[in-house]
């Protein structure tokens, strides 16, 4: 699954490379990210509009919370992911990318939404270690990926430390693999980077598009790196800007973690 953020679309990848993306649903607002809802095939929790909603198998949305409704500038949700302990995390940003207007939110299993970080401009990720004890978060506008310790029971974050600072391009979507490596799309550089847990650069994958945006490790063995790209803002988009790419890699990723609500999460 992937989202086309600004059009509000949730899309499924086709079986063949020449087939079009299959539409699942379209919301009347930006759709930043989704995670599967545990025990409910075809149901999703989403970072959308100014907050969080559930999407049922018919594509209908049921809103959980809209924490950015009263922000001083127009806001939207951006990237997000479920952690290994069943919580869902997502960042917000200003429509015009106003500096430090964004936040990182955590949707707990009991349905409560907590703002856990402020003063972010364009949050991307987060990504988590396999045990959920480490979180990586990019602020794309600053070119920085930070690493946070996470209390696995509560989801509380400890003090951050710098992990990666890019000199060219901006860190965008991220994921981790089973060896603890961090993969990040590098917007503006036409690349994907893999970093070892110590922050050293391990691998660079060139992508035939200038703005790689989101990524995941999937396929039957978890060794297919899927990379989305965008053509927004390009004066002269190339033929593959906006395409989705697949690259075989050596280290697999883990299956996508679901959101595991501790309350009854029936979508309408």
Name each region found by the language model.
Residues 56-116:
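Hydrophobic alpha-helical segments and helix pairs
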Residues 9-11, 51, 102-105, 144-146, ...:
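A short loop-to-beta-strand structural motif that recurs across blades of beta-propeller domains
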Residues 1-5, 44-50, 88-98, 135-141, ...:
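Conserved beta-strand positions in repeat-built beta-propeller and related beta-rich domains
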Residues 143, 148, 164-197:
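Loop/turn-rich, solvent-exposed surfaces of beta-rich toroidal or solenoidal domains
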Residues 39-43, 57, 105-111, 193-203, ...:
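Flexible "stalk/tail and boundary" regions
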Residues 28-49, 69-87, 116-134, 165-181, ...:
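Beta-rich, blade/repeat-based domains predominating
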Residues 15-16, 148-155, 248-254:
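Short loop/turn segments immediately following beta-strands, especially the blade-tip
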Residues 19-27, 62-70, 112-118, 159-165, ...:
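A short beta-strand motif characteristic of beta-propeller blades
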